[in-house]
């Protein structure tokens, strides 16, 4: 599942598990070799879910780099997508390790909710200034809401919708985003967040179930 990247990084000496939506793959010369839509696939969800569960089992903090607008629309993926998405959501919701989400691009609908959003337990959610957070893309939303409008009217309505429903400022006002950070300052804020969460202690019935599952797997 090359559309979902997982791995370990170091932030000020701390080991952090990173999960990211991948849109472009570059070769050794720095040229684009492969491109993906920023959507969730069944294989990508399973890959991320297993990685998050692994990190949680060993109390490794998790960082999510989110840029997702929906789901992969193909027969093969759709057969398994619901189960895989539930697995991913459960992994994030049940994980008691520190969880930080950075929105780097688009974050739309239930696909975003599953990618370590506030709704399923992210400790901190940061976003870049040009990020988009909402139920759906403004252009698609206005085509549904104003089906009979002209192209010029749709363009105007899309701007209004984007300002009211899709901007990162609106998401911050509603509590979905904790802080809007400049890309150049991102590392500093991530380090601060994980240092603050270093002694995090969380207990829920869900986390206890996951803990017992981890113990079973490890033994």
Region annotations inferred by a language model:
Residues 1-212:
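Ligand-binding clefts of soluble mixed alpha/beta catalytic domains
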Residues 213-219:
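A short, hydrophobic C-terminal helix/tail in secreted or cell-surface proteins
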């Amino acid at each position: 599942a090359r559309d979902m990247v997982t791995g370990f990084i170091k932030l000020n000496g701390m080991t952090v598990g990173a999960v990211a939506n991948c849109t472009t793959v570059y070769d050794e010369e720095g040229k684009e070799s492969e491109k993906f839509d920023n959507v969730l696939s069944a294989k990508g969800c399973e890959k991320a879910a297993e990685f998050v569960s692994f990190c949680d089992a060993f109390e490794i903090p998790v960082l999510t780099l989110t840029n997702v607008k929906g789901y992969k629309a193909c027969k093969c993926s759709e057969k398994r997508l619901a189960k895989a998405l539930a697995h991913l959501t459960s992994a994030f919701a049940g994980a008691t390790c520190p969880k930080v989400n950075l929105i780097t691009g688009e974050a739309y609908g239930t696909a975003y909710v599953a990618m370590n959003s506030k709704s399923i337990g992210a400790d901190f959610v940061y976003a870049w200034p040009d990020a988009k957070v909402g139920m759906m893309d403004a252009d698609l939303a206005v085509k549904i809401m104003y089906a009979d409008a002209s192209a010029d009217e749709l363009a105007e309505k899309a701007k209004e919708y984007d300002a009211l429903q899709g901007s990162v400022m609106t998401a911050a006002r509603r509590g979905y985003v904790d802080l809007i950070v400049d890309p150049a300052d991102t590392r500093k804020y991530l380090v601060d967040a994980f240092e603050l969460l270093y002694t995090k202690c969380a207990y829920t019935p869900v986390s206890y179930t996951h803990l017992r599952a981890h113990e079973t797997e490890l033994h």
